[in-house]
Each structure stands twice: as structure tokens, then as C-alpha cells.
């Protein structure tokens, strides 16, 4: 779509827990594994396959650092990530990983290559990129303030749900609430660690 990247597969989907577990299998023994599974399966995600010379590095450069606070403000994670690993996107880190993930998402997630994929991706962006209103910073600050102030009250998930609802027209309320809950679970973990 830019940087010489071609979208060869595009699909919006609700990720089943079983697929989320397979995707993050490399982290299965880590304490954050259950949270990762909940996060990726809480609301719809976009799955894509890009094709280009040096595609992996180009995508990783466009996304920025994994942790939002370390990402360049002009990178996608810097602009739209929420906090720490709530970073809006996953990207393969090596050709071997990409091959494994492409196989997983095509076989288990129904992602298919299509000559219409680029057009579908552009239509999706056009549909959701209306207006100049963006609640990312409000969501980010809600999470940051809750962690810094050790606030695990009911007002935090309520505020997250309210902000996510404004930013997610057409997405069912139960999916918005599920995403708000997963983000709040992260807040609770961070508060308990400090």
C-alpha cells in the first residue's frame, strides 16, 4: 500500500481462542500468554499478507518498536498503540516465522491470497478513516493514569468502553466490552507489579 508493499491477502476476522493459542505458542510458558490469547481474540483483527523486497523489515519499520512508549511517534504503534504491548499490530520477525504464520493463518484462519486484496484493504481504510476524530491518546492516557495512580476501580473499564465505543462504529458492544476488559486486565497486572 506504500513503501513498495503489496497486499496479497486481507481479511477481517474474530480470532478463535484455539487459533490465538497456536499463533502465540512460542510464548505458552510465559506468564503473559493467557493475556495475549485473550487480547487477540477479544475483538476483530485484520489479517494480511504483504509481498515486497525486504517486506518484513519494511513492515517492522512502519510499525515501530513493540512497546508503544518506545515507538517513534510517527510509526503506527507510536500513533495508535495504547500502552506497552497493547500495540495494535503483530508482524513476523523473520522469513521462517513469516512462512509459519502465513501457513497457520491460511490453514486455520481462512486467510486467502486474492487479486482483490489490495482493493479490499483500501476500502477498509476508507470506511474507517472518516473524520479527524481519534481517541487513541485519550485511551492511552486513561491506561497510563490508571497504572500510575493504582486505579483499578470500575470507572477505568467504563471509561475504556466509552472511548473504544466512540472509536469503533459498527462493532458490536460485546466485542468492545471484551476489548476494554482485556485492556483493564493489563492495567490490573501492571498495578499489582508495582
Across the structure, where does each feature detected by a protein language model lie?
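Non-catalytic terminal and connector segments of soluble metabolic enzymes
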Residues: 1-194
Amino acid at each position: 500500500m506504500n513503501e513498495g508493499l503489496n497486499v496479497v491477502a486481507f481479511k477481517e476476522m474474530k480470532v478463535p481462542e484455539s487459533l490465538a493459542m497456536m499463533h502465540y505458542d512460542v510464548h505458552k510458558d510465559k506468564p503473559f500468554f493467557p493475556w495475549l490469547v485473550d487480547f487477540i481474540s477479544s475483538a476483530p483483527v485484520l489479517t494480511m499478507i504483504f509481498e515486497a523486497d525486504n517486506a518484513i523489515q519494511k513492515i517492522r519499520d512502519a510499525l515501530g518498536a513493540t512497546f508503544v512508549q518506545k515507538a517513534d511517534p510517527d510509526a503506527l504503534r507510536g500513533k495508535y498503540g495504547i500502552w506497552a504491548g497493547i500495540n495494535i499490530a503483530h508482524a513476523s520477525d523473520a522469513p521462517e516465522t513469516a512462512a509459519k504464520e502465513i501457513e497457520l493463518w491460511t490453514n486455520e484462519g481462512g486467510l486467502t491470497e486474492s487479486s482483490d486484496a489490495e482493493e479490499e484493504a483500501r476500502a477498509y481504510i476508507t470506511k474507517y478513516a472518516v473524520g479527524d476524530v481519534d481517541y487513541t491518546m485519550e485511551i492511552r492516557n486513561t491506561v497510563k493514569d490508571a497504572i500510575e495512580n493504582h486505579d483499578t476501580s470500575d470507572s477505568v473499564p467504563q471509561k475504556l468502553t466509552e472511548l473504544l465505543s466512540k472509536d469503533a462504529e459498527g462493532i458490536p458492544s460485546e466485542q468492545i466490552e471484551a476489548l476494554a476488559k482485556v485492556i483493564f486486565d493489563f492495567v490490573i497486572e501492571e498495578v499489582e507489579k508495582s
